[in-house]
């Protein structure tokens, strides 16, 4: 973190961390998202952008339900619920960390231009919504 604070360009692996004892460890599935959110929180970034293989957060898995709708925005609480129920677009720990440190996250496609989906503490557009999304678990 010192090199980042000194305005030095830093190359950081996305799924590794250091334990309290100083040992390098891997963070598991979604570790790159967690790393990005942690760094954004540490440096006081106004937002953390996560680039992935989808255009944002959808009402359900668009690979399973072709007419699923992309959400322009969603609350941290709603995203935590979707992630904990199996939505794979963001790992639960990354969303929990973003929520804890109030770091808005924008999920964008690595392959397509677009506005993606903003995940934040409060979402005015969803104020009167009953259902934001549906997560499917394949058994």
Regions found by a protein language model. Give the residues of each.
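C-terminal catalytic "cap/lid" subdomain
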Residues: 1-137
């Amino acid at each position: 973190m010192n090199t980042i604070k000194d305005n030095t360009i830093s190359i950081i692996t996305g799924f590794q961390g250091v334990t309290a004892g100083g040992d390098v460890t891997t963070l598991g599935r979604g570790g790159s998202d967690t790393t990005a959110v942690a760094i954004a929180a540490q440096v006081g970034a106004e937002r953390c952008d996560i680039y992935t293989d989808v255009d944002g957060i959808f009402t359900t898995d668009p690979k399973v339900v072709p007419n699923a709708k992309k959400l322009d925005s969603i609350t941290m609480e709603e995203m935590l619920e979707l992630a904990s129920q199996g939505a794979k677009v963001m790992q639960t720990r990354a969303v929990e960390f973003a929520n804890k440190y109030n770091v808005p996250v924008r999920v964008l496609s690595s392959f397509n231009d677009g506005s993606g989906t903003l995940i934040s503490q409060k979402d005015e557009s969803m104020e009167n919504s009953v259902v934001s999304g549906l997560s499917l678990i394949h058994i």
